[in-house]
Structures are given as C-alpha cells and as structure tokens.
C-alpha cells in the first residue's frame, strides 16, 4: 500500500499455560464473546517483541455474543500491574463464538492501538482456533503464533 508505514509482524510467543488460560476464559464467557489483555516487553520503537509475560482475563462490558469491549476497570488494573512488572500492554484477545478466527469488520474499525497484537479465538468448531493479527489503518496482517511447553 503506497504511503503506508511498513511494519514487521512479530511472532506471538505464548506458554502452554497462557494459551490454556485464554481458551478456558473464552469457553467460560459463553454464550458471549470473552476478552482480555496481554502484557510483555516492547522494543525501543514501542513495538511488542511478541513475548507475552502476563495474560489478563477481562470482562466483556458489551455482554454480547457478537461484540466485545474490555471493561475499563480491567484495562486500568492490567495497565497498573504491567507497569509494576516493567512491561507494557501489547495486545488484546477475544473470542468469536459463531465465526472464524479472523478480525470482523467491527474488530478492524475498533482497533485503536496500532502497536498492539490482536488475538482472535474461534469457538465455532469442536476445537478452538487461536490466530493473531496486526491491525493498522484498516490493514490486517496475520502473525505467527508459537505455543511453548510450560
């Protein structure tokens, strides 16, 4: 895209425990979408390195099966906790209860943090599917996800 800032899509690194916590929270949120935040280190330019140090399950303030908004109290708590750990909030995750693990048009419109990673967990089929994306200026780029033993 001409004139658009180029950016590298980091590899999202989750421990097995972090992956299981995210997926469990998504199931716990049914029939609504579930959501939460991710914290980790950033590079000198403010870009997430992809390493996740903390997963913060949150409350979907929308209480909806089709949309999500992380409750502002959860956001403030996560920001404060990440700061005490010398980390930054580096992303948000949410579930799709009836669709694939890809950002919806609403997700893309509401993606306000260009440095963040956007994780979508689809519960549409028997097995959950977790995928990660960068969303900048309406452009969606998929990132690799690596789940390590924990």
Positions of PLM-derived features:
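Conserved beta-strand-loop surface patch within small alpha/beta domains used
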Residues: 1-89, 98-150
